[in-house]
């Protein structure tokens, strides 16, 4: 599989307490099938942060990768914006 075909997500770092691991919260809007209202959805991913460079509140891009642990299947590709 080519590297550019892997899934990518953009989200906000919600936790960096683990060593070389961050928790990224990804938000999106989804239309309710019956009522038609847009509902905010959130999903959390564990991602590999090799250099421990992310802080809480940073906006980051993560990419799908091979399983690195029981829950970790994503890795950090870039920090888009640092938290203020």
Swiss-Prot record:
One of its GO terms (biological process) is translation. Keywords: Ribonucleoprotein, Ribosomal protein, RNA-binding, rRNA-binding. It comes from the Bacteria. GO terms for cellular component: cytosolic small ribosomal subunit. Part of the 30S ribosomal subunit. Belongs to the universal ribosomal protein uS17 family. NCBIfam families: PRK05610.1, uS17_bact. One of the primary rRNA binding proteins, it binds specifically to the 5'-end of 16S ribosomal RNA. This is Small ribosomal subunit protein uS17. It comes from Porphyromonas gingivalis (strain ATCC BAA-308 / W83).
């Amino acid at each position: 599989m080519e590297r550019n075909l892997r899934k990518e997500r953009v989200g906000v770092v919600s936790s960096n307490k683990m060593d070389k691991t961050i928790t990224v919260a990804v938000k999106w809007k989804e239309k309710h099938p019956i009522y038609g209202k847009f509902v905010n959805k959130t999903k959390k991913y564990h991602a590999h942060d090799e250099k421990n460079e992310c802080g809480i509140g940073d906006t980051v891009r993560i990419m799908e990768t091979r399983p690195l642990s029981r829950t970790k299947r994503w890795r950090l590709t870039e920090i888009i914006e640092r938290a203020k």
